[in-house]
């Protein structure tokens, strides 16, 4: 470890100790923010998802015997991811050499900052909804950011929810390898309202649905293309 990296880790450890011992706070974000200002070279393979999904994946990976690095507290912006990496630094030094896997939750708009640095093996895209328009703006902007993030990490495999046309449209426009998942059939909890995506991303024709599970998620097709 070079002097710059050592200084970053030491500063992060001091910040974490101060937040936990003096201010009685978890300190997941500030240590990462401090470390990033000093050393931006902390990179580890990871998989992105929301809090519940990332924790489930982390538990499954840990059950396989691998060592897992995960931002379980939900600090899902760039400083929080770096903080999780630094938190794991001392643990990794004392574990036997073997398979080590990073599983990180990431804020949608921070994917463009996190993916190019982590270069994760997989990127999991669960769904996209208009529930945070005050912060994210139009859903089109969020799609653009995620697509650009994947373009900046071309070796990353996209795992996406094919029941969501907003996710499927991202998969169709990026060069990354992709794996689709979804629900095969109705769940008897269908909705009669489509909330976010009514038009084909390729030709802009109105999408037709066999059924809608929730929001825009369901079995859909484009009658034109």
Question: Where are the model-predicted features located?
Answer:
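Phosphate-binding loop of NTP-binding sites
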Residues: 3-182, 189-202
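Cys/His-rich short segments
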Residues: 184-225
